[in-house]
Amino acid sequence: MKSGRGDESPLAAGGPARHVPVLREEVVAALDCKKGGFYLDATFGAGGYTRALLAEPETHVLAIDRDPEAIAAGRALEAESAGRLILAHGRFSTLADIAAAEGIPAFDGIVFDIGVSSMQLDQPERGFSFRGEGPLDMRMESRGPSAADLVNTADEQRLADIFYYFGEERASRRIARAIVTDRAHTPFTTTRQLAELIARVNPGKPGDIHPATRVFQALRIAVNEELLELVRALAAAEALLREGGRLVVVTFHSLEDRIVKQFLAARSGRGQAVSRPLPGEPALAPPTFILPGKQPVLPSPEEIAVNPRARSAKLRFGLRTAAPARGLESGLLPLATLPETSHPKSASHSKSRRR
């Protein structure tokens, strides 16, 4: 579980292991846990959803996380579970390999809680937050280029595209130009250094979100390839769910939600023509998911009052049919990657590929 996403306001909790899992009851209801079922928590985080699943009668849980600190913190819970919990380190795009290594062929339910966790935001040394002083890192695992590497080496065009497409930042060109100018004299090494530059060149208006919010989101997504990971993970989850199994996904911003919404729409047949194909035309693939109830499910005002970070959360879920899994949804790849061609100004960037 990667609980409590949204803005960076304080969380009403007593430490990392007690971070509030967003939409906890709604997630459990959507999973419709059955006695003795096998479930996958694809984003363990502080373990909130895993704890909720283990509270159900005789359930078994495989929980994974790409952050080794989250796995290390969860070992005590694993030891207390009497063999009902298995923790594994890895990206959720590789969940098929992880499940195979653990000898689990299929699941009754899979839950994703997408994005950065409160644990990561609340540790300045991880470099995710602009609220404190920390290294400009943002990696969910220690390998690969950091945010500082990206900020200090990418050209102005690429930085502007990252900020616009992954952060929906309309001042992307102005911010990118300022970064390239400043780094020629002093490389960026800390979160505060970058946040102060952004606030200087794009101060925003009173009452707006912090000026650095969208840029930090964009860098985090780029560093961790979060949207591409999500596209791959949804296809992997489809293949691992047995008939009647539930796929439940909680998102915290429009880029994630759009991918999940379009995946479930495509796999459920929503929006497809209902008429029979003409002779010679390929038949429509049978739906792999049924979408029950009204969606998305949103947090209640009461939950938002207790945990303000929940306010941007959306829950979508699907019920797996007996139809064969279709594999990677190639139509979602443009939503998860930068375009091949860029536009000269952020104000003229086309949003057509995001619709």
Curated annotation (Swiss-Prot):
Name of the gene: rsmH
Classification via NCBIfam families: 16S rRNA (cytosine(1402)-N(4))-methyltransferase RsmH
Organism: Beijerinckia indica subsp. indica (strain ATCC 9039 / DSM 1715 / NCIMB 8712)
Chain sites annotated for binding S-adenosyl-L-methionine: G47, G48, Y49, D65, F92, D113, Q120
General function of this protein: Specifically methylates the N4 position of cytidine in position 1402 (C1402) of 16S rRNA.
Protein name: Ribosomal RNA small subunit methyltransferase H
Reactions catalysed: cytidine(1402) in 16S rRNA + S-adenosyl-L-methionine = N(4)-methylcytidine(1402) in 16S rRNA + S-adenosyl-L-homocysteine + H(+)
GO cellular component terms attached to this protein's record: cytoplasm
Family classification: Belongs to the methyltransferase superfamily. RsmH family.
Keyword vocabulary terms for this entry: Cytoplasm, Methyltransferase, rRNA processing, S-adenosyl-L-methionine, Transferase
GO MF term list: rRNA (cytosine-N4-)-methyltransferase activity
Biological processes, Gene Ontology terms: rRNA base methylation
